[in-house]
Amino acid sequence: MSVQTAVPIEFSDAAARKVKALVEEEENPNLKLRVYVTGGGCSGFQYGFTFDEKVNDGDTTIDKDQVTLVVDPMSLQYLLGGEVDYTEGLEGSRFLVNNPNATTTCGCGASFTV
């Protein structure tokens, strides 16, 4: 009998596909998508995304479709139960966080309050 461990943050299929495409484009299989939270933005905190080759002590990793999402411990507390997604629309394309912990968000969705 196998036991499944719940992941602290979801990594959507769309986000994993886009990360995979970007990693292949860069021809660097060591790249991982790192999501983080910093102070700032119009609502108090803001999300950030970067590609990183390193996983630091204490980081949480979520693997999906041969790519990895990385979250540092400080950011994870604000992202628990959320989802990293990717969207393409009239406003352009971007990674975003669907965060159930956010009590308010700004119009662009890049900053939030808890």
Swiss-Prot record:
Query: Which keywords does this Swiss-Prot/TrEMBL entry list?
Result: Iron, Iron-sulfur, Metal-binding
Cofactor(s) listed in the protein's UniProt record: iron-sulfur cluster
Which segments of the protein form a coiled coil according to its record? none
Q: Which InterPro entries does this chain map to?
A: FeS_biogenesis, FeS_cluster_insertion, FeS_cluster_insertion_CS, FeS_cluster_insertion_RrpA, HesB-like_dom_sf
Disulfide bridge positions per record: none
Please, which domain of life does this record's source organism belong to? Bacteria
Keyword Phosphoprotein carried by entry: no
UniProt xrefs under PANTHER family: IRON-SULFUR CLUSTER ASSEMBLY 2 HOMOLOG, MITOCHONDRIAL
Name of the molecule in the record: Iron-sulfur cluster insertion protein ErpA
Q: What is the lineage of its organism?
A: Bacteria, Pseudomonadati, Pseudomonadota, Gammaproteobacteria, Alteromonadales
